[in-house]
């Protein structure tokens, strides 16, 4: 018998495999990391201990008659710097941290994800609701305790990924995460994060793989329904003699989608490097991204003349649950008015410094760049009687065939003056169109952003049981929002009259929606901008501190943090270029600053090795989102913009053994 712990932090290792090739006997460790291997013969025995994420331990033991106590055995993490990343990410210990948390290992995700979307792996987690929404690739959303994603903090390696303007999370931007996740943890309620993040409903902490200690590689293929195919390859150099270790992973995923007209294609890449400078200092770098495009099933309105019965299997009226009213074919290929495309790479540079056994400094600098958007229709079809089928009031009516698919080839012919079959609606201005004229184009609503930040945490052990933590969280974000012409659909140009500085802008350049292209500057070079063009700027400075007490039976903490967020809007369409700075007609507003933060406290008491009780509570003051500060999509400042405040308290009981984990 014996026990297994993590050599880096002393945590128990449940579910590890212990196997003796000498006697062909094996077992697994229980929830506390303890194990008992029976049936070994006296004499020398070969023992192999393995656990996902840890270096395999091989040893030869001398076994005597009777019980043999091996004591506590330590396993070293196979990924370098992984424990430090978990500290930055505020990963809770399921039995010692006074929050309700559920943790999934990378091995569990790998074994169970299949061709599900990343959030769907959490659908059986308490207090979690996951839906695929329209059914497009990456369009899933998640609710924690009923709160939507704007009130759930999502963090990768401790770095927040909620949009800096509206707090949303777009899972299609992170399609490759399931392949590189080391640990996924959901904390319900205010959670254990030290940052002033929007964790009213809870937080989702994702820790990615780090550079692997062992040299090796792997390749895999996954196939599924509706043409789903995924190829993956991973390579690791292992730790080399110069202290450098590098791991690389790449995937390609494609399919037709379960819902009609929702074809998709996605790539993902991951590169992590760790360098051990000396015994007290190391650095690591990680880059990950997932360029993708996918067709969507967009919501419908009453003007589309659609009803729930259209999605039934009724032979008379229904078209089935897969019905999608936004797609058709163009030149024999699938074409959809609604297409999402994006590329959002994120890079981390982490530095770990041990001043002494009692004092450590962990710093993560990061940058996130994003470009892409979503397409939709623009224009109208109008007949002699004045009936209009336009992009606002029924683009699915009058232009669909008997199967409910949009007749895109006919739209192209109509735009060129060669077709008049839409309810006898002749095109009065072929080969050109405006939003108030005849014909359709496909536009793309774009979001191009740059996000820079640094997170630094200092930990100091005041005593054997007491630890003080303090840190800084600084961020700067700039988001550029505009629409561009994506497909002329047979027209030669599109006339936009929305720009006060260029009221008769004839656009002839179309920029295809293929992934997210950082090199595409046609919206500037070709003046390909329509409907709107504005920038959103957000600055963030936060300070945090925590005092934690811990012994064998209990733990308690109290934490405080505060942040200042600044918001600024620049509008290039609704205000003239030569307007006086600082005036009511200026393109740029002044910075609008808001203070916020939270205070939390909690304690956890272990009744025995299997049971615990805990309590926590806190007060949270959350700054308003960008759109609640600037009204009506212009520079009008909301005089009533104010923080949201939340007071929360929680009492809980937890039970753990080798088979049951209840809280």
Model-identified regions with their sequence ranges:
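Membrane-embedded beta-barrel scaffold of Gram-negative outer-membrane proteins
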Residues: 360-366, 606, 612-618, 642-663
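Extracytoplasmic beta-strand/coil segments of soluble accessory domains associated
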Residues: 119-160, 176, 182
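Short acidic/polar hinge/loop motifs at secondary-structure boundaries
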Residues: 36-39, 110, 141, 160-188, ...
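Acidic/polar loop-and-plug regions of large Gram-negative outer-membrane beta-barrel proteins
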Residues: 282-350, 375-443, 507-525
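A beta-strand signature from Gram-negative outer-membrane beta-barrel systems
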Residues: 73, 175-218
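Signature of Gram-negative outer-membrane beta-barrel scaffolds
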Residues: 441, 467-608, 630
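Transmembrane beta-barrel wall of Gram-negative outer-membrane proteins
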Residues: 216, 223-254, 259-297, 346-357, ...
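Short, acidic, small-residue-rich periplasmic hinge/interaction motif at the N-terminus
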Residues: 8-9, 16-21, 48-54, 64-111, ...
